[in-house]
Amino acid sequence: MSLEIILTEDGSNSIKNTIIDECYHSTSGAIDESQHIFIQNGLQAINKKTINTLEIGFGTGLNALLTQIECDKKKINNNYHSIENLPISSKDYKKLNYCKQLKVKDDRFLKMHNSTWGKETPISKYFNLLKINIELEKFNLKTQYDLIYFDAFSPNKQPELWTYNIFKKLYENLNTDGILITYCAKGIVKRTLKEVGFEIKSLAGPIGKREITQAKKK
């Protein structure tokens, strides 16, 4: 991969994949975007004290870090599974300024990145992480989840991940009242989610984005 560390408008870093010309986060603000989409409209929408979470795209680890912070604060047990086909290098993740921006120590963030792929690792009292180095299409889901962070590259860049078959697989491995949350608000994506069986809500997006999509299994 050819990656470049960039600075977004809220002062936090993101990474740009220069080969496909796409950033891992909104340039309007990486932390603001992840907090708004995945924490406020994902994690906080699940009313449980023990949550199984699946993340599609570990990326920089920002969603995992924000989730761990929120779960520790609210005393929510989170079994967090994250799929990533192309992990970033230690050279890159050590440059990211999330912990400085969030005013937290970097030990847990580094522990997430340094944890062994394919092995569940306790990051804090309430947060266990399992990173899986595999393509989503090849991943055999064995867990029923309460929450899915769908944070893959956009449909224009990774169309193979935004299909009926992928969403159907995720739907079948989501508990009743479980939520799939994504930054993508494209009509074709919402129609596909609805066709699979999800109940769709278009929610206000973070700064720089008009809408996001929350899909619930009923």
Regions found by a protein language model. Name each.
Residues G61-L65, P87:
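Glycine-rich SAM-binding Motif I of class I
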Residues G57-G59, E84:
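Conserved S-adenosyl-L-methionine
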Residues D92-K142:
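S-adenosyl-L-methionine
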Residues M1-I51, I69-Y98, L102:
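Rossmann-like AdoMet
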Residues E160-T176:
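A short glycine-rich, Lys/Arg-flanked "PGG" loop and its adjoining helix->strand segment in the class I
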